[in-house]
């Protein structure tokens, strides 16, 4: 299941940054990096530090600190290497720290008792799902700008209707097994 469309994790950047495909891809790439690395590091910390020392009650705080450090790293790299993308992401880049998708993936991995490898693979899958959803939404929104939409649905309403239709489409994948 797609974390954005089925569990509504990370909906703020999904709706806010999905106006242009390039910006959405940049945000998706940043989220892929942060979620993947955060899943690995938080799983290591949980399984080898917090759990053995009976410090499980600190997992949310520790996870947020790990995520914040990773986001700072991404922010520095983007500012130095890709200043145009850094500017276009604006306030949404530092908000990855509080993006519930990033924290949610880490917490769900712990809740499901995933090991380090399973947690990392879960992070990769979840983040690629986020990337796919945000890029698809951006592509649809770019096409919608050329459409004659009733004034009642212009702006946020049509975006929410589109997100709902995407969620229905992604739910169809839930019954597909390989």
Q: Which role does the model predict for each range below?
A:
Residues 142-160:
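Interfacial loop-to-transmembrane junctions
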Residues 48-62, 117, 121-125, 150-155, ...:
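Interfacial loop-to-helix junctions that mark the boundaries of transmembrane helices
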Residues 23-34, 57-63, 85-97, 152-158:
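Cytoplasmic-side transmembrane-helix entry/capping segments in multi-pass membrane proteins
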């Amino acid at each position: 299941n797609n974390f954005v469309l089925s569990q509504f994790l990370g909906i703020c950047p999904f709706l806010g940054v999905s106006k242009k495909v390039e910006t959405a891809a940049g945000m998706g790439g940043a989220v892929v990096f942060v979620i993947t690395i955060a899943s690995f590091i938080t799983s290591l910390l949980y399984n080898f530090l917090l759990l053995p020392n009976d410090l499980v009650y600190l997992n949310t705080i520790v996870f947020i600190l790990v995520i914040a450090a990773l986001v700072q790293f991404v922010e520095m790299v983007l500012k130095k290497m890709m200043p145009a993308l850094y500017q276009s992401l604006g306030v949404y880049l530092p908000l990855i720290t509080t993006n519930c998708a990033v924290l949610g993936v880490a917490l769900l991995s712990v809740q499901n008792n995933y090991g380090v490898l399973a947690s990392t693979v879960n992070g990769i899958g979840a983040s690629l799902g986020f990337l796919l959803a945000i890029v698809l939404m951006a592509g649809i929104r770019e096409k919608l700008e050329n459409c004659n939409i009733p004034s009642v649905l212009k702006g946020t309403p049509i975006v929410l209707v589109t997100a709902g239709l995407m969620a229905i489409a992604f739910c169809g994948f839930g019954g597909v097994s390989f």
